[in-house]
UniProtKB/Swiss-Prot annotation:
Keyword Cell inner membrane among record annotations: no
Gene name for this UniProt entry: hypB
One record GO biological process: protein maturation
Binding site for Ni(2+) 1: 2, 5, 7
GO molecular function, one term: nickel cation binding
Keyword field: GTP-binding, Hydrolase, Metal-binding, Nickel, Nucleotide-binding, Zinc
Family: Belongs to the SIMIBI class G3E GTPase family. HypB/HupM subfamily.
Protein name: Hydrogenase maturation factor HypB
Ranges of biased composition (kind: Low complexity): 36-49
Listed transmembrane segments: none
Length: 303
């Protein structure tokens, strides 16, 4: 996992900028350099014919790194990322900008779902997209074809967006006050779960072509998400996919996760998805209004 491997160092390119961004949150020794194994580095736990490398406090394995060393590296990386995320969140709040982080495996239909969402939302308020991929700007071009501005972040070898990248991309977007910002993360059900970008919610998109047990195989992502969009439901008649089992698996990992069945092609669930966006946006704005009123009362008490 990239909280210990430093896979993206120096690889990121934000479209329109003429230099690459090194990630200061990845400045640490690479675990794949051969060195004597520390005493703490235990062999993987075995259960019958299976090997479990995700045991121990770090819940990960890297040759030559102890569990305590891996934990320190992870805390350093995520601590720096969280500071950038807090800065992003403050900027989003100042703009009354509602931000969603869309996460999924490759091929889940994120971009098709997003373009259809944009078309249905219309121009009632400002919209923008930050696109994350290892290479190309194909998805950003699809978004721009809808008339909505998009900034492409190419992560190179990196397998996720981080808050520092998003902060740079946000600086390239204008006139978003009171609007919606969608962040389409790199297709990956592992690493994006750990990285807060400053968003209001993570939305996990799972297509019915992937298998209903994905929430159990990749629990961190579904635990981090507030909503699961079960996508490509128009294909269900052609697949052996147990919808109820999938939802049960997701709620085993995260009892509070909401689930909406959607299809960009047939339109199923799109109204419910848009209503969820409006409801969550309204809840967040009302919470900010309440906080501002409380601040105003505190100031009035000083008069």
């Amino acid at each position: 996992m990239c909280t210990v491997c430093g896979c993206a160092e120096g690889e990121t390119r934000i479209e329109g900028e003429h230099h690459h961004h090194g990630h200061d949150h990845h400045h640490h020794e690479h675990p794949f350099v051969r060195r004597p194994a520390p005493a703490e580095a235990a062999p993987p736990a075995a259960g019958g014919p299976n090997l479990h490398f995700g045991q121990g406090p770090a819940r990960a394995h890297a040759p030559g790194l102890s569990q305590s060393r891996m934990l320190r590296i992870e805390q350093d990386i995520l601590g720096k990322n969280d500071r950038y995320a807090a800065e992003n969140r403050a900027r989003f709040e100042a703009l009354s900008l509602f931000v969603l982080n869309l996460v999924s495996s490759p091929g889940s239909g994120k971009t098709s779902l997003l373009t259809r969402t944009i078309e249905l939302l219309g121009r009632r308020r400002p919209l923008a997209v930050i696109e994350g991929d290892q290479q190309t700007d194909h998805d950003a071009a699809r978004i721009r074809a809808t008339g909505v501005p998009a900034v492409q972040i190419n992560t190179g070898k990196g397998c996720h967006l981080d808050a520092h990248m998003v902060g740079h991309a946000l600086a390239r977007l204008d006139d978003l006050e009171g609007g919606l910002l969608f962040i389409e993360n790199v297709g990956n059900l592992v690493c994006p779960a750990a990285f807060d970008l400053g968003e209001a919610h993570k939305v996990a998109i799972l297509s019915v072509t992937e298998g209903e047990d994905k929430p159990l195989k990749y629990p961190d992502m579904f635990h981090a998400a507030d909503l699961m969009l079960l996508n490509k439901t128009d294909l269900l008649p052609h697949l052996d996919f147990d919808v109820e089992a999938c939802i049960a698996y997701a709620r085993r990992v995260n009892p509070d996760i909401e689930v909406i069945r959607v299809s960009a092609r047939s339109g199923e669930g799109m109204g419910e998805w848009l209503a969820w966006i409006e409801r969550q946006r309204g809840t967040r704005l009302r919470a900010r209004i309440d906080a501002l009123r409380e601040q105003a009362r505190a100031l009035e008490a000083l008069l």
